[in-house]
């Protein structure tokens, strides 16, 4: 696991070296499950915790990281994701992980709690919102349980199946922007490579109280990007071919000093 600090980002805010479209105002968030027609396929279970005027930026970044998905295997290419992240304007990588995190017989609920704390570390930000962390727990829970309704979703790929074992990929992408992130948005794409000593049909109905032998590898990185100073129409970003993935922020962070992270 590799973590950078956010001092550079905090210094920029404190020094007033740039301006965004308006002040960050603490306000309640409303949870909406949104399904829209789109000409672009994504292979992430997308979870956004952002103000409405920044939805376009969150979707644009999601589209960007779709480029890290291997079109043949649908696996998440960690090195490609780093390359994409290091090329984003007004942004920096603040945390990464690319390693095995579970290799034991474990109760699913315990595993969910452990992975939540790993995500907290990789995120590298102090997020106080209980609603956000509830969304994180829900997403992790759905990575390992409630699989039957998700069996054909784009973010899950079934791999090696046998009478005693099941392997699958599962990909999530979090976007977070609120008073805790200040004038930045954090994007956290996560890919799980999961092997369970359970036959697939059984696994589809596994619960948080069940135990099994799991091998779980996590590949993830956190990218923090300055908030856009423009409000793009949401309709544009549902067709990546008509929308620039690297549209410049007109208030560029001249002194953003975050070193690229190498794989």
UniProtKB/Swiss-Prot annotation:
GO-annotated molecular function: toxin activity
Family: Belongs to the cyt1/cyt2 endotoxin family.
Protein name, UniProt field: Type-2Ba cytolytic delta-endotoxin
Keyword Transmembrane attached: no
Species this protein is from: Bacillus thuringiensis subsp. israelensis
Gene name for this UniProt entry: cyt2Ba1
Role according to the record: Kills the larvae of dipteran insects by making pores in the epithelial cell membrane of the insect midgut.
Gene Ontology biological-process entries: sporulation resulting in formation of a cellular spore
Post-translational modification: Active after proteolytic processing.
InterPro entries: CytB_endotoxin-like_sf, Endotoxin_CytB
Gene3D superfamilies: Delta-endotoxin CytB-like
Pfam families membership: Bac_thur_toxin (PF01338)
Keyword field: Plasmid, Sporulation, Toxin, Virulence
One cellular component (GO) term of this entry: extracellular region
């Amino acid at each position: 696991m590799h973590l950078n600090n956010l001092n550079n980002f905090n210094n920029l805010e404190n020094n007033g070296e740039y301006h965004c479209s308006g002040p960050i105002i603490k306000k309640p968030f409303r949870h909406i499950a949104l399904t829209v027609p789109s000409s672009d396929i994504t292979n992430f279970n997308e979870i956004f915790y952002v103000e409405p005027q920044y939805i376009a930026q969150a979707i644009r970044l999601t589209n960007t990281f779709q480029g890290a998905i291997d079109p043949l295997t649908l696996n998440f290419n960690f090195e490609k994701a780093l390359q994409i992240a290091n090329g984003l304007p007004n942004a920096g990588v603040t945390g990464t992980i690319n390693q095995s995190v579970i290799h034991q017989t474990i109760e699913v609920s315990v595993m969910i709690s452990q992975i939540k704390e790993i995500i907290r570390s990789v995120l590298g930000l102090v997020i106080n919102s209980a609603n956000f962390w509830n969304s994180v727990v829900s997403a992790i829970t759905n990575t390992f349980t409630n699989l039957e309704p998700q069996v054909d979703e784009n973010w899950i790929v079934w791999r090696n199946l046998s009478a005693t074992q099941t392997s699958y990929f599962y990909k999530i992408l979090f976007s977070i922007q609120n008073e805790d992130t200040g004038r930045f948005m954090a994007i956290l794409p996560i890919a799980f490579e999961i092997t369970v000593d359970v036959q697939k049909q059984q696994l589809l109905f596994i619960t948080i109280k069940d135990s099994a032998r799991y091998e779980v590898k996590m590949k993830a990185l956190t990218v923090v990007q300055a908030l856009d100073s423009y409000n793009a129409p949401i309709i544009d970003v549902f067709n990546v071919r008509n929308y620039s993935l690297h549209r410049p922020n007109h208030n560029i962070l001249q002194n953003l000093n975050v070193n690229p992270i190498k794989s």
